Amino acid sequence: MLADAEWNEKKVLDRRTSRDHVLKGVSGGFAQLCHGKEAPLKRMNPDDWIIYYSPKQNLKDDAPYQKFTAVGEVSDNRVYKVHAGEGFSPYRRKINFLKCRETPIHPFIPNLSFIKNKRHWGYSFRFGHIEISEHDFKLIVKQMVKI
């Protein structure tokens, strides 16, 4: 699953997803990105990996949380639509989440290549779904799952 020989897959980071929403996805075994949009899910392939970053614990709380909250592997080719109520029908994709611990971002900032401006590191998260390097992925995941 995370053996060094298996690093040909795409690694993506989803930012700006509150912790409570990430945990719903983890418990349900799915990813839902960019307010339920289909396109970012379609760009992913089986065996690709996703790391969730949560700036807040929930949408109503303004207190910063700023942790990597989940890591998982795309399990199949299917992107599907669900009816979540109140006219909201988001797209989802099946993910096999690893058991991991939530990890603060701050110790990683100096060493993450996708963060170009270390002083204003939050700018790196303005796009919802970004591909990250193998180096960045390994750095984060090794702390989250203690490989």
Curated annotation (Swiss-Prot):
SUPFAM superfamilies: PUA domain-like. Pfam families: EVE. This is UPF0310 protein in gntR 5'region. The gene is oug. Belongs to the UPF0310 family. Gene3D superfamilies: ph1033 like domains. InterPro entries: EVE_domain, PUA-like_sf, UPF0310. HAMAP family: UPF0310 (MF_00771).
